[in-house]
Regions:
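Flexible "arm" and connector segments at domain edges
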Residues: 1-64, 68-108
Length: 108
């Protein structure tokens, strides 16, 4: 699935099952909540905190997909083409950082 397909599928899902998009501020709050759920899994599974028994069956991929879903909703609402935005962002990073990371002694 491409980002463009994902944006179309989310839009269709919202129109078919969700009635309408939540407003942008509500979706921003939801995005923050979903990112927090990903952070909790990462912190407990890969960080120094112990993982609670109730968190051991949480699916990291599913939580990341929740983040992506809400991000796509926000992109659709605000007219952002994620394919174009990601390409521009990668181009910017490539031009800005093409030698920076290679020269970073901490990464060697």
């Amino acid at each position: 699935m491409t980002l463009e397909n994902a944006q179309q599928q989310v839009d269709e899902w919202i129109k078919t099952h969700g009635v309408r998009y939540f407003n942008e501020l509500t979706n921003m709050a939801m995005l923050t909540e979903e990112v927090g759920e990903v952070a909790r899994i990462i912190a407990r599974r890969y960080g120094e905190q112990s993982e609670k028994e109730s968190d051991k069956n949480k699916d990291l991929g599913d939580e990341m997909a929740d983040v992506l879903f809400v991000l796509i909703c926000l992109a659709n609402q605000t007219g952002v083409n994620l394919t174009d935005a990601l390409q521009k962002n990668l181009d910017k990073k490539t031009n800005r950082d093409k030698d920076r990371h290679k020269q970073n002694e901490k990464l060697k």
